[in-house]
Structures are given as C-alpha cells and as structure tokens.
Amino acid sequence: RGLGETNIERMKRHLKEKERKIKKKLETYQKGRALVRKGRERRGLKTVSIVGYTNAGKTTLLNKLTGRKEYVANELFATLDTRVGELWLPNKRKSVLLADTIGFIKELPPELLNAFASTLSEAVESDLLIHVTDASDEHLLDHVDVVEDILKSLGIHETPRMLVMNKIDQISDAKKKAIINAFPKKNLVWISASEDLGLEGLIERIEEEIG
C-alpha cells in the first residue's frame, strides 16, 4: 500500500511540474503578442481563427491553407502558442490572417484555462471562427459541446463561426448521415485536411462569411 501511495504522489508531482512548465511557456508566448497584433492591425487584415478539440487536425489545416510547415503532433497541447499565417481569398482578391489555437480538452483546470485565455486572444478578437472537428472520433458530439462551452466561457460564443468536419476520408456514408442528423441546423463543411479534400469549398465558405 505504501508503494502505491508513493507512486500516486510521484504522479501528482509530475503533473504539477508539467503544468508549471506549460504555464511558463504560455507566459513567454504572451509577452510579444500585443506588439505583433498591433502590426497586423496596421495592415488592416481581418482575422480567422481555427478552434477545436485537441487532435482535430487544426494545425494540419493551417499548414495546407497557408503553406506553413508548423509542427503537427498527436498529443495534448502540441500547439501552445497561436500560430498565424496568411490565407489568400481568390474571389475577394485579398488576404486574411489565419490563426491556429491550442486544442481544447474536457474539464480543463480553471487555472490553465486562465493561462490559455491569453494565447486565445487571436480567437477572441477574430472576425470568424472555424470550429474544426474530427468526424471520425466516436466522441464527436461531446467534443463539439466542450469547445462550445469553452468559447462561451471566453465570451466569444457569438462570434460568427462555421462547423467543419475534418478527416472525412476516415468515415462511412452512414456515419456522415448520422452527423448530418445530429446537426440539423448547421451548414456543415466537409474536408480532409491531410488528403486535400474539400479545401476549395472551405475557402469559398470563408469568403462568404468574412464579407
């Protein structure tokens, strides 16, 4: 029993240390963000932010749409800062800023949510949110609810947004039909960022929404 308690304490210390390192990274990223944002404002570009549950494919989508080569990993908090690229809108003949944000998780500790809020400043000030989901995940509906709840807690639930179903190359027609039935009032966008499916249609929707 004593050994078990020791292991539990060791695990708690490990998690505490990991949380401390994450907070420190977030503080570092936050310092220069205000100056960078002012520079973007001077250029007069609108901002579109990609939000979603962790591992939904947000960074892959940013890379494909902007030509950036950001780190992609199947792990929590792989994207701690907010990465930003430019997306060219051909029909509008102008660019918008496209920002990738951290992946949300269920029951995010309040102290970490406060720290992450600073990195989500791009999303808070965005003209449009792209809520990316993993259509192949069995917990899809729960993940959508988690993201919506966090957006509400950040006060940005009324920002215009679209719901994008990613990884459609991994789902059956029956699963697609079930998803459509689950979101009867949503004009869903269907893509596979990794396979370059539906990206042109997504850009057209962004053009429509951004005005």
Question: Can you annotate each of these PLM segments?
Answer:
Residues 1-113, 120-124:
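Conserved G1/Walker A P-loop phosphate-binding module
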Residues 102-105, 135-139, 167-172, 194-198:
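Conserved nucleotide-binding/hydrolysis micro-motifs of P-loop NTPases
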